[in-house]
Amino acid sequence: MKKLQVIIEKAWDDRSMLKDAKTKAAIRKIIKLLDAGEIRVAEPDKKGNWIVNQWIKKAVVLYFPIQQMKTIEVGPFEFHDKIPLKKKYKKLGVRVVPHAIARHGAFLAPGVIMMPSYVNLGAYVDSGTMVDTWATVGSCAQIGKNVHLSGGVGIGGVLEPLQATPTIIEDNCFIGSRCIVVEGVRVGKEAVLGANVVLTQSTHIIDVTGKKPKTFKGEVPPLSLIHI
């Protein structure tokens, strides 16, 4: 793995290396590992702190320029894109309702349910989670176990504009209809966001349960109920 990291870091600093077959193979290997859930762009340590593997995120960014546009035919439907679609859902134990789409490079754990929705590459969606109708999971976003992303939810990615930290939704969260969570905001375990809540790094999240109000930015504490 260290050898792959060295290649990615060098290619990030010198984009001319993207023409090299060895570099392309390394990038595609990383995407394949992401697709299988063997590596992650971000992961919690034993204390619950999230560690971002920046070099893996860089590999996701570098994947686009080495890919060629191709026509993808799925029954009567046709797409034209650089990134292949994820496949073999039955083997993965994932329920996918037409017209849900996940890209190659996104990990979906067994028990995930995708209603007509979209999961971008580099994302990690853990077991028991439902991605409801018209919800979108952005590039490299990290979604925990038994999460419900309600209809029309938007979980931001890291690619456009390029973000330092992926958006994180921890285990057992409920994200209400039409919520937007972007810019690397972290939603702690078992938190509930009411419908239409919008969270960015500059959003003031005010805890009024104590004697004095307490303000958070960029993170939602575990077990919180957030509403507008």
Spans of model-derived segments:
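Structural signal for interior beta-strand "rungs" in well-ordered beta-sheet cores
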Residues: V94-I226
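Terminal amphipathic alpha-helical/low-complexity segments used for targeting or macromolecular assembly
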Residues: M1-R95, K217, L223-L225
